A protein has these predicted regions:
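P-loop NTP-binding core
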Residues: 1-199
């Protein structure tokens, strides 16, 4: 994980990169131990053991490896800890998946309000990511609330909402059971061509 970099024990992030079976796609895995940054990062900063402000450590890590990649995707937990603040400060574009469901929509509203309040106290060094909303769990079934929720979300966030949506499907979960991605599923393992395409 990036924990040793976050704690000032490594100078670059290349040690954490792991190849995958797909050419050109590498990952840096994470685990629960990475949550140590929530309790230890500020202490390391106070001791003078970090090369940058605590909220800029992920940006610094990415800068050490960015020359090897065209695109870097970061997945973050939906909380407001120092890890998420690092993601916000490291991202050029921040895509926030928001299910087309009422409770998820209200949670996203609260998340953005809290994030805005929190970032008022953080020096972003003149950088602010482009924030976009991605509608997920979208259903076209009769009686679905998704079309109505899409209208509410687009009214609230306007051009921040991406045009495309992620449709609700069981194909991803079925692939996980078989330890395969949706791209690796055999044709006879798919519910239907349409459901597979939605995945």
């Amino acid at each position: 994980t990036l924990l040793p970099f976050y704690l000032g024990e490594k100078d670059d992030a290349s040690y954490a990169i792991k190849p995958t079976c797909w050419p050109g796609l590498d990952i840096i895995p994470s685990c629960l131990a990475l949550h140590r940054i929530e309790t230890e990062l500020m202490g390391k900063f106070d001791e003078g053991k970090l090369p940058a402000d605590p909220h800029l450590m992920l940006r610094l890590a990415i800068e050490t490896i960015a020359h090897d990649y065209d695109v870097i995707v970061i997945d973050s937990a939906p909380n407001l800890g120092i890890g998420t603040i690092n993601v916000v400060c490291a991202a050029d574009v921040l895509i926030v998946p928001t299910p087309a469901e009422l409770f998820d929509y209200t949670s996203a509203l609260q998340f953005f309000d809290m994030l805005r309040d929190l970032l008022k106290n953080v020096d972003l060094k003149g950088f602010e990511p482009d924030v976009r909303i991605l509608l997920t769990k979208y259903s076209n079934n009769n009686g679905s609330q998704s079309p109505w929720m899409e209208e509410q979300i687009r009214d609230a966030w306007g051009s921040m909402v991406l045009k495309n949506v992620v449709r609700e499907t069981d194909e991803v979960g079925k692939g996980q059971i078989r330890m395969r991605t949706v791209f690796e599923q055999a044709i006879d393992q798919r519910s239907s061509t349409g459901a597979w395409r939605n995945a």
